[in-house]
Amino acid sequence: GPWIDMKTERYDFRSELNEPFAGFKKLRAQASYTDYQHDEIEGSEAMTTFKSKGYEGRIELVHNPLAKWEGVWGIQASQQKLDVTGEEATLAPNETQKYSLFGIEHRQFGDFHVELGTRLDHQKVDVDSEQKDFDGNAFSYSGAVNWDFKPNYKLSLVGSHQERLPLSQEL
């Protein structure tokens, strides 16, 4: 029967600085590189080959309390190239670039704890075929109020709006 021969290389970098500059508690940075390939083999022949190379980076800034609000804000960027070849290939080669801004804040008001979050994503997918390229945005946000009305008891109200951008395979 068919089987898969897979190879993956991944490199990660993570760093954190305490009190990097005035007004901020922490600066966190992450970066990664992934090189992935798998062959779908039937008998002794590779029928389809998937190759994917990608980079991702993220920077977060944790700020000191500001009007009693505490939180983190950040940016994230990624790039991925996907190439599928062979007799049974169903995906066109493509490149995806994605950029994001995000933030999470929280504050205590007596017995109430308020949490707010937001994220804005921009994504562009260039497809090497007659398929139309994709260029779009997604905006998500959430809010929560937690009421500690009695020791060991909490009542929460949570609301959110989530948007998701398509993966290149979904186009």
Regions found by a protein language model. Give the residues of each.
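Face-selective signature of the C-terminal outer-membrane beta-barrel domain
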Residues: 5-148, 153-154, 158-160
